[in-house]
Amino acid sequence: MDATFPSQHNITARPAPGRIRREQCKLAKRLRRQVGQAIADFGMIEANDKIMVCLSGGKDSYTLLDMLLQLRAKAPVPFELTAVNLDQKQPGFPKHVLPEYLSSIGVPYHIIEQDTYSVVTRVVPEGKTLCALCSRMRRGALYAYAETQGFTKIALGHHRDDMVATFFMNLFHHAKLSGMPPKLRSDNGKHVVIRPLAYVSETDIIAYADAREFPIIPCNLCGSQENLQRKQVGVMLKAWEKEYPGRIEQIARALGNIRPSQLADQSLFDFLALGRHSNTPLPNAHAWLAGDLANDTAP
């Protein structure tokens, strides 16, 4: 009997284990380089910093903690890391996952228990997104804990794509050119917030989290809401990236390459002084429009 071979169309090529390991090592090295570069560029970590790493149980915060642990092993300055999670009392939240994981890797941690879930679901009208209020309450709880424990820095897991998306959300919905900075001082002036994943793409984080097999905890509070503005912007950016590969990276670079004289913000550039040949006060808009205003008729 002749041997029967499978159709070419039924054969699925699988990468060799050695190749997979090499690709994973290259990915980890790239992430370490990008995180280390961001830390250096923005002065995120100083000697003897006591850093609170906000761990939600999502891919971003797991990757953040993992990268900081790897970099700390060979860092030029000593610093401490403590993972902190806010248990918002969401129904079905697997409380055992984070303690078991953090204990297994020997990372000090603390779980803050605060029922923000009931407050948010009670206060926000049905059909409205919960993210804004949830974020404010979560931030308040984390900041309060950081203050009581004397943390010098608060590390968040926002990545490059988050920062680009925030820029467009502010552009589209608030008419302003602002985004999500890699490092900032909190509104109350008491905390320094850092985002070490500022140079890392979401695609790489997804691949890294998958390779490391982190015990991901989905967000059932806001993750299932399909009408979020951020998701809409995300769809737009992914479409751009698919049609024009590298576009998100170009936009991210542009956020650090501002030319105030090429925009129109008078607080950043003195347009009034440009080309002036005398010190005579310039007429204001009312003076320029005086003729039109005089001819206006009352409604």
From Swiss-Prot:
Gene Ontology biological process: tRNA thio-modification
Domain of life, per lineage: Bacteria
GO molecular function, a single term: 4 iron, 4 sulfur cluster binding
Gene3D superfamilies from the UniProt entry: HUPs
InterPro entries: Rossmann-like_a/b/a_fold (IPR014729), TilS/TtcA_N (IPR011063), tRNA_Cyd_32_2_STrfase (IPR012089), tRNA_thiolation_TtcA_Ctu1 (IPR035107)
One family name in Pfam for this protein: ATP_bind_3
Keywords: 4Fe-4S, ATP-binding, Cytoplasm, Iron, Iron-sulfur, Magnesium, Metal-binding, Nucleotide-binding, RNA-binding, Transferase, tRNA processing, tRNA-binding
Pathways per UniProt: tRNA modification
Transmembrane segments: none
Residues reported in the UniProt entry to bind [4Fe-4S] cluster: C131, C134, C222
Motif (PP-loop motif): 56-61
Cofactor: how and how many bound: Binds 1 [4Fe-4S] cluster per subunit. The cluster is chelated by three Cys residues, the fourth Fe has a free coordination site that may bind a sulfur atom transferred from the persulfide of IscS.
UniProt keyword tRNA-binding present: yes
Oligomeric form and interacting partners: Homodimer.
Family assignment from sequence similarity: Belongs to the TtcA family.
Main function: Catalyzes the ATP-dependent 2-thiolation of cytidine in position 32 of tRNA, to form 2-thiocytidine (s(2)C32). The sulfur atoms are provided by the cysteine/cysteine desulfurase (IscS) system.
Note: The thiolation reaction likely consists of two steps: a first activation step by ATP to form an adenylated intermediate of the target base of tRNA, and a second nucleophilic substitution step of the sulfur (S) atom supplied by the hydrosulfide attached to the Fe-S cluster.
Protein name as catalogued: tRNA-cytidine(32) 2-sulfurtransferase
Gene: ttcA
